[in-house]
């Protein structure tokens, strides 16, 4: 049985997510106490479909369906690994790794292309509306605003359907694992030669009233330490997993 999210692109993404689950399970040591990889992947697939199907009819728009597909995949991978291995930190690490492996490639190239084309990224964002773009792209279950100054643009997320999904399913601590995917594009921006760096001083998932993404014009950004509340949060349990002796 294949995953059916009602969107062919997201169906393909689900296929690659499950493929990456299998690869990650096969990479782990034989003594990790896990069952056959194909069996666990089948359970993740079935769990994902059950969670998604239970919610899809009540969703307000197709964009919410995409959000719930992502979240259902992450939730199922986390819960099935945790149930089998009795290892919560390991389950967080597994779900986070597989999610990032699945999505980081397309984002990496899109952000790099944007930075190559645009000499003054903050100026570009000042003339454009990030809030309008994301509102159209993410749908009515999300709420966005923006703030602009001469040298900075701030994207504000006032309502997050991703976090609400995990709250509703009793796993609010999973949201920062999903949020950590934003580090992919944030780090690309921060390391690029263009005069722009990012900050994320607050998120809803870490107790803030909103998620704030700052895009700051900075010609002297080299060596500046990242400002990211999620990066700090993921250094603490339950997210911080013990080092895997089989890595490296």
Placement of each model-derived feature along the sequence:
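A short, glycine/Asx- and small/polar-enriched loop/turn
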Residues: 151, 207-210
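N-terminal, charged low-complexity regulatory/assembly segments
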Residues: 1-81
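Short, cationic low-complexity segments
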Residues: 176, 228-248
